[in-house]
Regions:
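Short, charged, intrinsically disordered terminal tails
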Residues: 110-118
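Acidic phosphotransfer microenvironment of two-component signaling modules
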Residues: 85, 107-108
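Short acidic-hydrophobic, aromatic-tinged amphipathic segments that line or gate anion-handling sites
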Residues: 101-105
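Amphipathic alpha-helical interaction surfaces in cytosolic regulatory modules
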Residues: 22-100
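Short, low-complexity, intrinsically disordered N-terminal segments
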Residues: 13-22, 117
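Short beta-strand/loop segment at the start of cytosolic alpha/beta domains
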Residues: 1-17
């Protein structure tokens, strides 16, 4: 299944819902382009909803790490939500879970931005 992306804005937060594969090539490049476009427009609060991701390779994992680093450098935050077990296990195996803010639902991820603003 090719990667599809649904982008929306919720109370100043950009949410990308990803479905399909995040693998080397146009899939990773497309996600990276969205993140860079958001940051270029000073939209630096980002949530990636990964519930419907069916496959991810090392390039996809690298892109997620790179996206967090770029977002933090721009003074923003990038959070992950609804991780499939596959992605959770990969991040855990490579000791990368602590590199991400991970939430069980989109609502939880969005609410976390409001809590941090207080």
């Amino acid at each position: 299944m090719q990667l599809t992306i649904d982008a929306k804005e919720v109370e100043g937060v950009r949410v990308l819902t990803l479905s399909g594969r995040i693998v080397a090539g146009p899939e990773v490049d497309t996600v990276r382009s969205f993140v860079k476009e958001f940051l270029g427009n000073h939209w630096n609060l980002i949530v990636l909803d990964l519930a419907n991701v069916t496959r991810i390779d090392s390039t996809g994992i690298g892109m997620l790490v790179e996206s967090v680093i770029l977002t933090v450098k721009e003074g923003g935050q990038l959070k992950l939500t609804r991780l499939p077990r596959l992605i959770h296990n990969i991040l855990s195996t490579h000791r990368l879970l602590q590199a991400f803010d991970i939430y069980p639902t989109e609502a939880d991820a969005l609410a976390s931005f409001a809590k941090e603003a207080i």
